[in-house]
Regions:
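C-terminal amphipathic alpha-helix
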Residues: 51-96, 100, 138-199
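Membrane-embedded alpha-helical segments of integral membrane proteins
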Residues: 1-20
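Short, solvent-exposed, charged loop/turn and helix-capping segments
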Residues: 98-130, 148, 175-187
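Central hydrophobic cores of alpha-helical transmembrane segments
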Residues: 28-36
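Hydrophobic beta-strand residues in large extracellular and virion-surface proteins
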Residues: 13-14, 65, 103
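Transmembrane signal-anchor/signal-peptide helices with a preference for the extracytoplasmic
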Residues: 38-57
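Membrane-interface helix-boundary motifs at transmembrane edges
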Residues: 19-27
Length: 199
């Protein structure tokens, strides 16, 4: 009787071992694609989060430039006699100083955005916007020392760097962007015509 019992146990052990091997193979077959899918989806989410941080910082950096354009055009609208007078010149210099300070703080926030080393397109977008911010910083620096009579003209580097940044930002968008990123990027770069100060 006990011999039959030992045979039954042996058969069960052999069967269990074979079943375990089959289950391990099946698990490896399922686990590989699941692991790959989780890596891809995790990286997609990380890219969206990083790019959302960059777009938010860029929006904040654009704000002082839009404000500068509004303020300087308000001064121009008063007429040449107004902005060529000493008080008008000082008002323009002071406005430029304030916006320049705002821009430096906002540009620093753009530089501080953390990007994974393998997300090259986001890094490229970040660097191209930093160059654009530097071009604007130099331009506003000219306005802070403006004494007349010729107005500082917007350097062509501002427009060129803005166009490059636009292309890089569009390239950095993920396949299915989250956080309304596509429309936010389009909004940032939709006002290029209004940016250059031409009285």
């Amino acid at each position: 009787m006990w011999i039959n019992y030992l045979v039954l146990v042996a058969v069960l052990l052999v069967g269990t071992t074979a079943l375990a091997k089959r289950l391990r193979r099946l698990w490896a077959f399922i686990y590989g694609p699941l692991l790959l899918l989780s890596c891809i989806s995790g990286d997609w989410l990380l890219r969206n989060l990083e790019f959302e941080d960059l777009v938010t910082a860029t929006e904040a950096s654009e704000a002082p430039l839009h404000r500068w354009n509004r303020e300087i055009h308000q001064i121009f609208d008063r007429g040449v006699d107004s902005y060529s007078a000493p008080a008008g010149l000082e008002e323009m210099r002071q406005t430029a100083r304030e916006r320049h300070r705002n821009l430096l703080v906002a540009t620093n926030d753009v530089e501080q955005v953390r990007v994974a080393p393998w997300h090259f397109s986001i890094t490229r977008a970040q660097q191209s916007y930093e160059r654009h911010g530097q071009a604007w910083s130099e331009h506003l620096g000219e306005w802070t020392a403006f004494v007349g009579p010729d107005l500082p003209t917007a350097d062509g580097e501002i427009k060129a760097s803005f166009d490059i940044a636009e292309n890089d930002f569009l390239d950095a968008l993920t396949l299915f962007p989250r956080f309304d990123l596509r429309s936010r990027v389009e909004d940032i770069f939709s006002e290029r015509v209004l940016r250059l100060v031409t009285p």
